[in-house]
Amino acid sequence: QYYKPEMMVGLDYSPYAVDLATNMHKGVQNLNFIQGDAEKLDFAKETFDVVINVESSHCYGTPELFFDEVMRVLKPGGWFSWVDFRPKDKVSELEKMIDLPGWECKRNKVITQDVVRALDNIHDRKMKMIAQHVPRLLRGSFREFSGVKGSKIYNAFSNNEIVYMAKTFQKKI
């Protein structure tokens, strides 16, 4: 909207998520959603000015392949914005994986407590939605998945057992 990009591409492994996103964003010009594998991006070298990855790389089988692929598809001078979480004892492993020689980390921030505050702020609304729209039998699972207060993920963030990070890289020219 502000920068008038020639194209925007959303990629998801799930064809159902692609269909949902396509239907939800029909009116957005130059935006396409495609099904694909983040560890094997089906784009030419140096295609994108910006790659954004939010809360998904922790699900990848081989995240280092994903980071290599981002490096490959980014144009020189391009930006990679990444936000995700890892167990505290896996952060140093992630740092080694993501610290590629072809880009420079421009921003590196732990945002775990910001995430906890956001979860606190939306807690009541999530609980109300779950109570109104989810069958009683499934409510416990939905509370866990949504990260409400008292859930395992909420407690892990609160106790700093899981670290939530935001990083921005620029590919070297």
Language-model features: locations:
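Hydrophobic packing within well-folded, soluble alpha/beta domains
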Residues: 8, 33, 48-51, 70
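A short SAM/SAH-binding and catalytic strip from SAM-dependent methyltransferases
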Residues: 49-63, 86-88
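A short glycine-rich, Lys/Arg-flanked "PGG" loop and its adjoining helix->strand segment in the class I
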Residues: 64-79
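Conserved S-adenosyl-L-methionine
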Residues: 103-114
